């Protein structure tokens, strides 16, 4: 069977004789070098992209897409009205009020400084992924308890490990918002019962955050209404545009921030690392490609007499 002319010519010059074996070896090594370099580049880019997406999903899952504050002394004292206004903004799908403060959590064996987050359990579960992150217990247990029973507290698994506590154990929270006494300002203290443990996949979050009901946090931290409102939008990447539209529609008395603003330094560092890896591996591919060019030049020079 006769081979096609093009295939015959290709095989003739690819299958080198003994004196051409060195050139063919260089070609093979260079080709393999390019293949390995490209493979390493694709794997590195895939890993960095996957890391960025996973980190983004975990960060956004632990909080809302947009935060809204109201400037002034009254702030969000009547947050129910603000919730309804914000729900009317295009592309906003969910809204939840939040109170945030610092406290000292103590048990019989340990203590830790925590960030206390007051929430409406039903609304918060719609805005963030806290509901699906519960590993033991339930977020619904934060509902108002009966007379004489302790209020519920949901904490991260990392924080539970630091305190040596489990679901059902009692924890005392102390806040600096206390009352004046002859001894000075006495911290406000209140006992809680752990009703749930969560794991958001973020070490800092899981080791320092605790959730209580909004009205409980207001009394404990001496707040009125809510500190800010978390919003969820229909498209994660539309959050910056929606935040700008909220400021335009509601006026300059409102301050907004989206998830990308709050984590800009982190994602910028990841982007720079991704670019550095791409450039480094790209140079490796370039060196291998130059070897291929060199081997082809040698091959052409060797075969120049055979070219009519």
Task: Map each language-model feature to its residues.
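N-terminal Sec/SRP start-transfer signal
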Residues: 1-38
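Alpha-helical membrane-protein architecture signal
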Residues: 3, 7, 11, 259-263, ...
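Amphipathic alpha-helical segments that mediate coupling or scaffolding at interfaces
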Residues: 13-14, 54, 58, 220, ...
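Hydrophobic C-terminal alpha-helix "anchor/cap" residues
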Residues: 14, 59, 85-90, 246
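Hydrophobic alpha-helical transmembrane segments of multi-pass inner-membrane transport and secretion
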Residues: 23-49, 271-308
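Membrane-interface junction motifs in transport/secretion proteins
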Residues: 52-83
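A structural signal for hydrophobic secondary-structure junctions
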Residues: 80, 84-224
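Mechanotransmission and gating elements of multispan inner-membrane complexes involved in transport
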Residues: 177-178, 185-277
């Amino acid at each position: 069977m006769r081979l096609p002319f093009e295939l015959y010519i290709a095989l003739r010059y690819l299958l080198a004789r003994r004196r051409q074996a060195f050139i063919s070896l260089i070609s093979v090594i260079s080709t393999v070098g390019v293949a390995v370099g490209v493979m390493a580049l694709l794997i590195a880019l895939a890993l960095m992209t996957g890391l960025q997406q996973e980190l983004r999903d975990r960060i956004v899952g632990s909080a809302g897409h947009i935060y809204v504050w109201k400037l002034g002394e009254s702030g969000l004292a009547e947050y129910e009205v603000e919730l309804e206004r914000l729900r009317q903004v295009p592309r906003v799908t969910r809204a939840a009020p939040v109170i945030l403060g610092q406290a000292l959590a103590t048990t019989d064996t340990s203590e830790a400084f925590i960030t206390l987050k007051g929430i409406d359990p039903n609304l918060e579960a719609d805005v963030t992924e806290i509901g699906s992150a519960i590993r033991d217990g339930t977020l619904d247990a934060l509902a108002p308890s009966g007379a004489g029973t302790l209020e519920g507290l949901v904490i991260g698994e990392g924080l539970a490990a630091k305190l040596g506590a489990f679901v059902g154990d009692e924890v005392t929270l102390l806040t600096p918002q206390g009352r004046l006494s002859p001894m000075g300002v006495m911290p406000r203290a209140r006992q809680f019962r752990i009703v749930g443990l969560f794991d958001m996949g973020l070490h800092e979050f899981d080791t320092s955050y605790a959730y209580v009901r909004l009205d409980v946090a207001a009394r404990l931290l001496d707040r009125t209404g809510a500190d800010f409102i978390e919003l969820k939008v229909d498209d994660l990447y539309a959050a910056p545009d929606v935040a700008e539209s909220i400021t335009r529609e509601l006026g300059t008395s409102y301050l907004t921030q989206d998830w990308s603003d709050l984590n800009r330094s982190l994602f910028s560092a990841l982007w720079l690392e991704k670019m550095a890896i791409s450039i480094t591996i790209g140079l490796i591919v370039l060196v291998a490609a130059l070897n291929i060019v060199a081997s082809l030049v040698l091959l052409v020079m060797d075969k120049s007499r055979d070219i009519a």
